[in-house]
Each structure stands twice: as structure tokens, then as C-alpha cells.
Amino acid sequence: MEGRRFAAVLILTICMLAPGTGTLLPKDRPSLCDLPADSGSGTKAEKRIYYNSARKQCLRFDYTGQGGNENNFRRTYDCQRTCLYT
């Protein structure tokens, strides 16, 4: 019985400490994640990723290559790491 308890505590500890396993609470999420998608004021057409706080998802948008705001990621992974996971 003691071995099972130790194993359970060990597994829980690993899960809590492993990066990318927990969802951030809204108060812990960086404020940039609450900004709307902003395509900017340039003339290019680049696919970028932004965090949609209402849908709690990282979504694609067209970025013009100039201006905009900080809620602008090149990769979905970066958006998720910043706005979804610890």
C-alpha cells in the first residue's frame, strides 16, 4: 500500500512540474493574448497566428508585415505556449 501511495504522489508531482501540461488561468495569461487580431498597415500578405481569447484558440489571420500588435505569432506552437500553457 505504501508503494502505491508513493507512486501516485510521484506521478502527480511529475505531472504538475512538466512544462506545457497545465492551462493558464486568465489572470496569469499575458495581456497580449487578449488583444484582437491586427493585420497592420503594410502591403504584404503573410499568414500569422493570433490568440482568440473568446474562443480560447490560436487562429490564423493575414498580416501585412508592418504594424499590428503583439498578439502575432509565426507558429501555432508559439501562440499556444504563450497563451494556453505554462
From Swiss-Prot:
Any signal peptide, and if so, which residues? 1-26
Database matches in SMART domains: KU
Give a Gene Ontology cellular component term annotated to this protein.
Answer: extracellular space
Which superkingdom is the protein from?
Eukaryota
Ordered alphabetically, the record's keywords are: Amidation, Disulfide bond, Ion channel impairing toxin, Neurotoxin, Potassium channel impairing toxin, Protease inhibitor, Secreted, Serine protease inhibitor, Signal, Toxin, Voltage-gated potassium channel impairing toxin
Domain named BPTI/Kunitz inhibitor: residues: 33-83
Q: Which GO terms describe its molecular function?
A: potassium channel regulator activity; serine-type endopeptidase inhibitor activity; toxin activity
Task: Note the SS bond partners.
Answer: 33-83, 58-79
PROSITE patterns according to UniProt = BPTI_KUNITZ_2
**Where is it chiefly localized?**
secreted
Listed Pfam families: Kunitz_BPTI
Residues annotated with Threonine amide modification: 86
For this protein, what post-translational modification is recorded in UniProt?
Contains 2 disulfide bonds instead of 3, as for all Kunitz domain proteins. A double Cys-mutant carrying an additional Cys bridge does not show difference in activity with the natural peptide. However, there are some differences in the kinetics of binding of both peptides to the channel.
Q: Where in the cell is it found?
A: Secreted
Q: In which tissues is it expressed?
A: Expressed by the venom duct.
Say which family it is in.
Belongs to the venom Kunitz-type family.
Q: Which PANTHER family match?
A: BPTI_KUNITZ INHIBITOR DOMAIN-CONTAINING PROTEIN (PTHR10083:SF374), KUNITZ-TYPE PROTEASE INHIBITOR-RELATED (PTHR10083)
What is the role of this chain? Blocks specifically voltage-activated potassium channels (Kv) of the Shaker family (IC(50)=1.33 nM).
Entry protein name: Kunitz-type conkunitzin-S1
What is the source species?
Conus striatus (Striated cone)
